Amino acid sequence: MTPTRQSLASPPCSPLVAALFVQADGCYSKLPTVDAWPESRDARRYAGPLPVVAHPPCSRWSRLARFCEVRHGLKVGADGGCFEAALRSVRTYGGVIEHPAFSKAWAHFGLPRPDTKHKGWTAGACGGYSCYIEQGRYGHPVKKATWLYVFGVSKDKLPELRWGHTPDSRGTISKNQDWRGGMDKWRDSTGHRAANATPPEFRDVLLRIASMANA
């Protein structure tokens, strides 16, 4: 019997990792091996069973959060329970949380604080690991200093990342631009969507880490 075009097609892939708190049409949305949870699905309700890559909202935990509280009354940590839910998912199903470096959520939830000068992973009493990494080394237009928290992956399986600082702190922004304003200035001129976007190469690193959880 001659096989039909449908029978020759590749079988559909089942999701291997859940991506929580992501943009609806962002870099995770069309990956067949990823179960994407944008705002419309409310990732706080995620109940497994897949390991996760979590990008919980960061504005209430950033280095400017205290200023915003004083100036605008927006309380530090008042994110509707998003970070707490992300942490619960990571500790229950394994995976990784991505947040801006110096996020106040680390101290609030007792996570191991990375050292910006340490090229490697920092172990915590909880059994997880944190690290400092700059997304500019993975294609982001500015350095985008980042902290990661991983749970459910043994130390010997944690990958070596591109440690260290992005050359001249400018990421891939064109060298003919005098860009010394950093992430905040670039976000103001370009928009939060571009600033918050995860470079595809860095996304793949996070997915690889999550896929090793509880293996």
Model-derived segments and spans:
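Class I S-adenosyl-L-methionine
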Residues: 1-215
